[in-house]
């Protein structure tokens, strides 16, 4: 009798008694979406599927088709639309329709396993909707809801969330991401992971690393500096690991600086496991590691997806000593640890499933992330006396999800026209009746495998929307544009003719319901833009470099992604990062006007802000804090988001909210030292309602250990800034600084101290040994400061 998998302590013995073939089958994935079970060792299979917006029906079909016992059936080569449709059609009707067709009958039974009682899957809001909420509580709540949905149908690992950075507006999968700012992405990612894993399934943060475009995604190298990598593109993963305790991370298709992520020891082992301290399971994106299985395992990959994989070459590599069995054992150990943690969590956390509650959570999330961009003369919410006509095909057919991994096959849908009629009784569609208000719904789709061609809305609406809005204004009507979009769109042509603009992004199956609630005032728009909306694409930071040249994508904008770049270049935008209106009004002010932060004793800085709802409706405000280092050692943005808090208040209600700022929000990565540094000294703190709407500012003095100890490599300017350092240098040099004219010192501020002293003192002390000893004594004294 062999060892049994019962807990983490049992894993070493289980691994020791597994056969080589069992180990290889474990890391090679048994079928498309689940690992190999070993019944006599009590090792269960775990099911890994997309995604963060709900169950991906294609995965359900592929997992059945890739069973090794069906390898000879030609119809199992790929999932047909007819097969995938079984995730949403009536299963009783499907069973009758395919009676006598063994494969399709089996697929009906497979679909039924994922649809208990024939129920429909829920399509949840996209990542951009969640990021737009600017609220970790919302992110955690929707994460838990998605986890409950997936657990109910037997999924153990969800391929999500997508914690990449929205680098360029045309990125095909930007709508899956939480935004353009690393602090926003970090807080949202960690909260979503906590929520999902609280439902008893594992989250899988993706795609590691610098996966920001779909063009040539399998061959492109993202070329960026270590600083940019750490400050921006690794930040969401770091937060998911440290604050979310994510159990699984997925590698990306792309290369980074010439090394494909799935084969890179530098990224998977040195960075992810070493610097970011990840101890969970690393899985490949589908097909990203299939060409060199031996190489990907050696680099640090634990699970090669999708299965089944032919592991013959890996077996030979182990037998010939080219791949250490110890390495293979480590990979198997990580998978078994994942299995144990999932099963322990599922025993500890009762399964919960309430479809109505999940749909309500989805709807509230859309409302919390809906961004009111424009609202002249308080057109919204629409008064009950308004006679409304809807225009645009998307008024009847909501763009609910993107294509590819986030696509959810379901018969649950909603649209704003039908839902508005349920609430208000009557609304026309595309006819010039006696209506006094026009609502035009426009969309901008996106999805996996292809980047957006432009920032335009769908072709059917590009000229039509402007013409219809113009005509409505000529008739004296009020006009509202409902934006059902994957990211920023061009607005110059039509925005002047819109009294109001409301953005619901890619909302999932409850999009129509939420939109109707927002239009009628049953809900308040609580979102803020998680990405900048530029006036034109040519103004965007990555425009000269996106999507790259051949198979190279050069991240030439560096740390100046999104609002950081527009602020640095003083470029006007259509709508700035963090902006969004409410149906009510707020007063927001700092409670203090001067801040000191001793980082040696305080992990966080709490900034008290007084917020009052001075309007007539309940609503929410997002208090944002930005910071600036006054004398940075390296090129830094003028302002960066360092903290935010969402406040919900009734009319007349007032509160003081403490906005928390972490050390990580203010640090920077010094590539020369190859480590994080925590700047000290003078900073400015900005209270804002967007990256542009600054309400107040206050000085912030940060105290702590100097990340740049004073020594011979320090500049003359740095020495002069520190009175004690200046005094010490004068002691060792007989008053050098007092003897040099000020205009000469001003010219020398960027010269290194060692260069100046070595040249000047050698003339006085020609004995180099003695001189070196004196200088070392000086530098030792400086280092004590």
List the predicted regions and their residue ranges.
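Terminal connector regions
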Residues: 663-706
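Low-complexity, acidic Ser/Thr/Pro-rich "mucin-like" tracts of secreted and single-pass surface proteins
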Residues: 75-79, 731, 785
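Phosphate/pyrophosphate-recognition segments in soluble nucleotide-handling domains
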Residues: 347-360, 434, 695-722
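In a subset of proteins, long, contiguous C-terminal domains/tails are tracked
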Residues: 562, 578-583, 616-618, 649-653, ...
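Glycoside hydrolase catalytic-domain context in secreted enzymes
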Residues: 1-667, 682-686, 691
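Compact, charge-rich alpha-helical regulatory domains located at protein termini
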Residues: 706-774, 779-782
